[in-house]
Design a protein with these regions (language model features):
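A glycine-rich helix N-cap at a beta->alpha junction
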Residues: 203-218, 234
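Structural signature of outer-membrane beta-barrel domains
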Residues: 156, 170, 184-186, 201, ...
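Membrane-embedded beta-strand positions of outer-membrane beta-barrel proteins
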Residues: 149, 177-181, 212-216, 232, ...
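Beta-strand-rich binding/interaction modules
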Residues: 23-24, 37-104
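Large, well-folded core regions of big proteins
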Residues: 16, 224, 250-257, 261, ...
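Amphipathic alpha-helical substructures
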Residues: 1-48, 53
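Non-cytosolic beta-sheet module surface loops
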Residues: 18, 56-59, 153
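Outer-membrane beta-barrel initiation region
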Residues: 81, 92, 103-206, 244-247, ...
């Protein structure tokens, strides 16, 4: 800057000249595009001395990525690989590792770190389950389940203590569940609610998110009868072509289905069950007000 104002191209030129490897991928992928990097393991096999595995490129964007061998949270080896095809196979010395991890220290800005682990001891469960109280930050080392004690009340169920289990953390996931089993003290039966949702994201489209969900509630509406309410729903979220524009549109379609048991306390049981269709549209824009 003593001679003139430097820019990114000066920085790129210096790095390119000093690097012993081709680093065009860094500027083309990380700097100049919205492309995302996402690798995962497939076809892992191991012996006492070696590990053979394939690395699957989920987005088709190629970049060097480090592979770590971990034993009891200690790094026993680290190897950089440069996948050139959609599925590349490698063999490394095991060095007593009990798991292998892609991008363990997050050195490469990868889109999804939840699929980076592969256990060499437990085939069915790559990441151990960890229970955390209430809301917590994302920890890609574990399959996190959040729990929270709950207490609700209605006249026919009385006090209904329960425990809420969820996998929803701050970062979005494709699949979310929220289950709240409870016990109705007055009725002496189980009750509660649950919700499950699946998200599809479209990175380069104005239709950027489709969300499918279903929720249910099960409680008493009379001393001798329960009701079950089901709520299947689909949402379409749309943004502007200019991604910096905060205007968002949403189309929501849902069906509310209620099934009620017949009750001796209700004089008119001619149509205890019903179903209602609901559609909704919103168009919002969030901006700071001067």
């Amino acid at each position: 800057n003593q001679i003139g104002q430097s820019n990114r191209y000066d920085f790129e030129k210096i790095l390119t000249q000093k690097s012993q490897k081709d680093i065009d991928w860094f500027f083309k992928t990380i700097i100049d595009s919205r492309d995302i990097i996402d690798y995962k393991f497939s076809d892992v096999s191991r012996t006492t001395d070696s590990i053979t595995f394939s690395v699957k490129n989920k987005t088709g964007i190629y970049a060097p990525i480090p592979i770590y061998g971990i034993k009891k949270k200690e790094v026993v080896f680290k190897e950089w690989i440069e996948p050139k095809t959609k599925d590349s196979t490698y063999t490394f010395s095991r060095k007593n590792a009990d798991k292998i991890v892609i991008n363990y220290d997050n050195e490469v800005p990868e889109y999804n770190q939840r699929n980076n682990w592969r256990s060499l001891k437990h085939v069915a469960l790559n990441r151990p389950i960890k229970f955390n109280f209430a809301k917590d930050l994302e920890d890609p080392d574990y399959n996190q389940i959040l729990y929270l004690p709950t207490v609700n009340y209605n006249y026919y169920d009385g006090i209904t203590p329960g425990v809420r289990f969820s996998n929803k953390t701050i970062l979005d996931k494709p699949f979310n569940f929220d289950v709240n089993p409870a016990y109705s003290i007055k009725a002496g039966t189980l009750s509660g609610s649950s919700a499950f949702s699946w998200n599809q994201y479209y990175r380069n489209s104005t239709l950027y998110n489709v969300r499918y969900s279903i929720s249910q509630n099960y409680f008493h509406y009379a001393p001798d009868a329960t009701y079950l309410r089901l709520n299947p729903m689909v949402q379409f979220r749309i943004r502007e072509k200019d991604f910096r524009d905060n205007r968002k549109q949403m189309f929501l379609f849902r069906q509310v289905i209620v099934n009620r048991e017949a009750s001796d306390y209700i004089t008119d049981n001619s149509s205890p069950n019903y179903s209602i269709f609901n559609a909704r549209y919103s168009n919002t824009k969030t901006e700071l007000i001067d």
